[in-house]
Amino acid sequence: MSVPWARVRAMRLLHTSDWHLGRSLHRADLRAAQSAFLDHLVDVARAEKVDAVLVAGDVYDRAVPPVDAVELCEDALLRLHDTGARIVLISGNHDSARRLGFGSGLLEKAGVHLRTRPAALARPVVLEDAHGPLAVYGVPYLEPDAVRGELPPGQDEIPRGHTGVLGHAAGCIRADAEARGIRRRVVMAHGWVSGGAASESERDISVGGVGQVPAELFAGFGYVALGHLHGQQTIAPQMRYSGSPLPYSFSEASHRKGSWLVDLDGEGTARIEQVPAPVYRRLSVLRGRLADLLGSAAYGQYEDDFVSVTLTDPSRPEGAMDALRARFPHVLVLAFEPEGVLPDQRGYRARTAGRDDLSIAAEFVRHVSNATPTAAEKQLLASAFAAVRTEEAAG
């Protein structure tokens, strides 16, 4: 006998990503802030009776994380497991897939599912409720040149680039779900989907100058839980980035951080609610003359914030950082741009903001040789960056 929808609880998922455990903000220690977020995440999972927590990559900030970051992750996974939720976690471009995936077979038996190997991306975590099965597929970050030989086989040759490998992955997932007869399907992936807005804190993943993939690759899934971009955002109603739980650059000062609470009914249709993350310490970007910043009551509201300051005095004031720190104890960045400065006189950080590695390297070649790099030189630079990414992906 069928159960009326009104009486049947939906499958509830909690989508988070980009914890970047072990990361600092301009050398400011963020361990307490990251710990506070994980406490919040556990509280949400318990209070909302979450069935599964989806962690869409970049658990750690680097391939070999510090010991305290590993301990923080272990504690968080243990406490999330104690809420009764299953956990599905994929590796991101900052993670070492092999290290993060250690012990995955044992952890699977405890309900913690690590999807870090490309070969396993079409092997779902199957959740059951009164509506029947729901398949969660975890696609780890796929570095195109490094994983082509590790992907599940398909009928066609895999094109080069991110679109090629992710398109192949999506095709393998659809084929597996059809073979299993499972209609409700959720996909987790780590990458840059077209329409998503980047910040200054994501690592460039472009290959041959192309880092984005079309959203159409993931058409037809009940929900797509994305990681990589640090701003919480919606690509399509059923396709979202949770974003990082903390701001990891001052370009994120205006971001509202959080997670997504996702309910899936019997048809796989998502009902989605934003869950705001706690604000450990605000980020503020200030600009003005030193005397105004130190003396004006208008700046009093920023005294407990992490602060980035750009001074516009006609000449560089002496002892500016010490003076600023007396009023703003958590000032982290000090830049100097006198009023009327020409664009090419900006600092290095301002000139490179939002640019990919290849264009920055090409500008360096122009600077030292006084000539635009040739096509062969650009190809050499692109190959060098690809080799580094492949080495990082191998762990």
Task: Provide a role label for each language-model segment.
Residues 18, 38, 58, 73, ...:
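Divalent metal-coordination and catalytic microenvironments
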Residues 16-17, 53-58, 86-93, 113-118, ...:
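Active-site neighborhood of phospho(di)ester-bond hydrolases with catalytic His/Asp-centered motifs
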Residues 50-68, 85-98, 191-209:
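Active-site neighborhood of divalent metal-dependent phosphoester/pyrophosphate hydrolases
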Residues 5, 9, 47, 52, ...:
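Accessory, non-catalytic peripheral segments of nucleic-acid enzymes
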Residues 24-26, 59-76, 91-111, 116, ...:
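Metal-dependent catalytic neighborhoods of phosphoester/phosphodiester hydrolases
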Residues 102-208, 276:
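Conserved catalytic scaffold of divalent metal-dependent phosphoesterases
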Residues 194-195, 199-268:
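Conserved beta-sheet core of the metallophosphoesterase superfamily
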Residues 2-78, 82, 383, 387:
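N-terminal active-site segment of His-dependent metallophosphoesterases
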